[in-house]
A protein has these predicted regions:
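Gly/Pro/Ser/Thr-rich low-complexity, intrinsically disordered segments predominantly at protein N-termini
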Residues: 1-140
């Protein structure tokens, strides 16, 4: 069981999250597909039967590449802010970095930046330390 799956009152991590890979989000008139998205279970107690969600997630993670960087930053970030997504991670495999953003009002604020093979505790998952060295492909 993942620490994100732990039910309330259990042990082993923060629990209380649904984390989905490439969920389809219908946010107003916009349809977005982040690389990862997470909802706190108190906001979404059950996963919907529909193949999409109209409920904005609490956290999104975009894996940035040269072909998606502009879309992620210029198009998606303002929509996530408009829809009150609380946290946004931008993972840059080419740079081996993680940028962590928190929404304050309608503005994204950089909370922290990490790189390389660090052990990371990043909002909103500070209870877990992520080993960033496991995120990157081995160099040839």
């Amino acid at each position: 069981m993942s620490p994100f799956d732990r039910r309330s009152g259990g042990s082993g991590g923060p629990g209380g999250w649904w984390i989905l890979f490439e969920p389809e989000l219908h946010l107003g008139t916009d349809i977005l597909v982040p690389d990862l998205a997470g909802w706190r279970r108190e906001r979404m107690p059950l996963l919907a039967d529909e193949p999409y969600s109209e409920l904005a997630p609490d956290w999104v993670c975009e894996v940035v590449s040269p072909t998606t960087a502009r879309i992620d930053r210029v198009h998606k970030m303002p929509i996530y802010a408009r829809e009150h997504v609380s946290y946004l991670w931008l993972v840059h495999p080419g740079l081996r970095t993680l940028e962590v953003y928190r929404l304050e009002g309608q503005q994204w604020v950089v909370v922290s930046s990490h790189g390389g093979a660090e052990g990371v505790r990043a909002e909103p998952f500070e209870a877990i330390e992520f080993d960033m060295s496991r995120w990157w492909l081995e160099e040839a």
